[in-house]
Every structure is written in C-alpha cells, then in structure tokens.
Amino acid sequence: MRQGSTACVFLLATQTWSQHHWSQHKAAFLLRVLESLTDQLAKLGVPLQILDAPNFDDATGHLLKFSREIGAKKLFFNREYPLDEKVRDERVRNSLEENGIECEPHDSFLVFPPNSILKDDGHPYSVFTPFKRKWLAKAEGEGLRSLPCPRPQQSRVLETKIPGEILSTRANFGQNLWPGNHKHAGDLLETFLNGKIDRYHNERDFPATDGTSKLSPYLSLGVISPRECLERAQTLQRTNSINPNDGIETWVSELIWRDFYTHVLAQNSRISRGRAFKAETDKMQWNVNEEWFERWAKGETGFPIVDAGMRQLNTTGWMHNRLRMITSQFLTKHLFIDWRRGEKYFLSRLVDGEFAANNGGWQWSASTGTDAVPYFRMFNPLRQSERFDPDGSFIREQIPELIDANPKFFANPTAQNDLFSSYPSPMIDLKEERERTLTRWKRFNQTLS
C-alpha cells in the first residue's frame, strides 16, 4: 500500500486441491478465513477479488487477465514451496513480467525461508539439531519485529465474491471447532502465552490435557504469522524472570521443526513427487492389506489409543501430535503399510494439513526421512497409552464403547472382549508384527550392502 493503490486477489484452485488431498475441514476453514479477510481488508479500503481457477495451470491466465483489468503495475505474492506450487509461481511470474507487470515474491509462511539457514560450507542441513542451533542464532541476531498496520486507502470499486462451496462442502462445516478469523487466532495465542506455555514442556504429550496452542490450522493458512508467534515468545522469554523458560523453548522448537521440514522439502524436489528422502528406501516392499488399512483409518484396530487418535482426526479434522506419532508408527511399523498411504489419508482429513510438516512426520515414523527415527524403534501403543493417557480419559472421550472401561484394560485390550463386545479385538499380535518388521528391515538393509 505504500507503493500505490492496492487490490488483493485469491485463486480458488479446487481441482488441484482435490488432487492434493485437501480435507473438507481445510476447504471449509479456508472459506471462513476468506470471509473474515474480506472484512479486515474492507476496513483498510482494500478489495479482495476471489477468482475461480480450478487448476494451477489456470492461474497464469486468470492473474494476467485480472491484472490488465485493474491496470496493475506490480504483483506481490507469498511463495509456497511444494514443487507444483513453485512451478505455478514461476509460470505466473514469467507471464506477467513478459507483459510488463513487475512481480515481487515474499516469504511469510515460515520464520526463515529456505536457503537462508545453511551449513558453513553452503549446503543445506539434513539433521535437525544443528539446524536448530543456527536458526536460534539467526532469530536472536535479527530481532524480528512486527510491522504496523497500514493506514486505510481510498477504496477501489471491485466486486468481492466468495463461492458458496468448495469440494462439495460449505463454509460452516466445522465452524464451531475452527473459527476462521485472526482475532480467534490471536486469542488462542494470548491464552497460550498467558499460562499454558509455562507447562507446555510437561503437558504437550497428554491428549486429555488442553496443553497445546491449537494454532496449527491458523499457521497453515497464514491467518497468524509464525514470526508473530516467535516475537511474542521471545518477548515473554525476556521478561519471564520468575518461571523457567522450558515451556517457551519447547514451543519455539516446534516452530523450528516446521521451518526445518519445509526447508528440506524445498531443497529436495523428489519429496514432492512422492519419493522418500532416503532414496534407497523407495525399493522397500510394503504390505498391501486393504482390510488392515481400513481398520486403521476408521479407528477399529482394537488398540484403544490408536483408535482414539484416528477417531479424533475423523471427527474434528485435528489430531494431537503425540497421537500423530503413535498412529503413524502403528501403520508403518506394526502393520508395515506404505507411509504414503497414511500421509495422504492424514491430508484428506486434517484441517491443518501442510504438505511439508505432514510428509516430514510420516517419513520420520517410517524411518525413510531425514533425521528419522531408526527402523528398530517402534512405539508400543499399549505402553504409550499407559504413559500418556494413564486413566483413559482421552480414550473414553473418543470411544463411546469404552466409556465404562477400567483403565487397566487399555493396556491389555484382549481382556475386554467379553465385557465390551462392541469394541473390536486387537487386529494383530504386537510382538509378532514387531519381529516381522525388524526382519524385513534387516533383510532390506542387507540388499543395500
């Protein structure tokens, strides 16, 4: 707005989003975000034009036509880092610049954009811990500060129109769970920083406890900036002379993981093509068992903590991070089903689905990714249940069939068969499947040597 009269435009690429496995929750959440953004921009005298460009291939023509209609001299846009998005942006930029319209990209999706944090030899990091050290040093040295809100401009008369449906879902789908406005995101951040963050390092792994920020959907669509989150956390850290900063440091680490996985994605195009970061693991022969996959997806495995996590995902569009690790390891380690199937399923359900973070998490669990868990490390869902849902509060909340179950049964679900006949028996023997997976990995590694 400092460079002249400004209009905003957003492209609805509904067909591409469907191909990219966007969930109904995310599509509806986006509509609510756009509705709220329209009101926010109107207060600044800035119109928002919503264009229906079903495929990324349509973006160039729609933006060029719109730019000509309003006499635009310059296009400002935020980069996205998956391969399809990078190709789309490059095509748009080339076309507009060939037609005399300057383009200026920005990077607001992350705290620090890809290739801004590199090793001393100029190569990208593939291990998180040294990446984190350099990230923290850069954050401390740069002293991030939020920009003031611009002054209102003289409004340009443009029609603002938002289609009523995306991917066969309306904007009110999941509205009570995920209001789509910056004020709500700001309130969540305020509530988190004013108390929960002090306990975050101790409570974040317990799904029955409201111990996380719940900001991931708002970060995923840019409703709130990760830099704003970091700035607020840094301010709190500097003024927090009474309480230890363990919670703040742990939460900031989650922002760093988000940057890390996106950097890895941007620097390795094979990941966007459905390939593993560890190229040799693309040769792994995974189980193909539709019945097992369907039982996992529906939350009917017979392992309560796994089923509770999957039912939370299917119902709300969100899953606690500890449960994301438990359920993904169960699929890739105990069922030995291809991580890509789970990755796509999560994206098709998550309101906060981000390709890089979701892919990074799945490849971590499957031992195919960068800085991944070793193949022999497998979360035992029964021990995880004992540790992180000891009284079964979360399990009972998500699985009505187990509302009256004794917590001791959650660590031994075979004992429930007679009392809780509506809940399925365990679908596998954990010990047997663990041994099978270890054998498969050992044999696979031998083929590489």
Give the ranges of each region predicted by the language model.
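Active-site-proximal binding-pocket segments
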Residues: 210, 214-396
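Generic alpha-helical segment signature
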Residues: 30, 182, 208, 299-302
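A broad detector of short, well-ordered amphipathic alpha-helices
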Residues: 65, 183, 307, 325, ...
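Trp/Phe/Arg-rich N-terminal binding region typifying the photolyase-homology
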Residues: 1-143, 241, 311, 439-444, ...
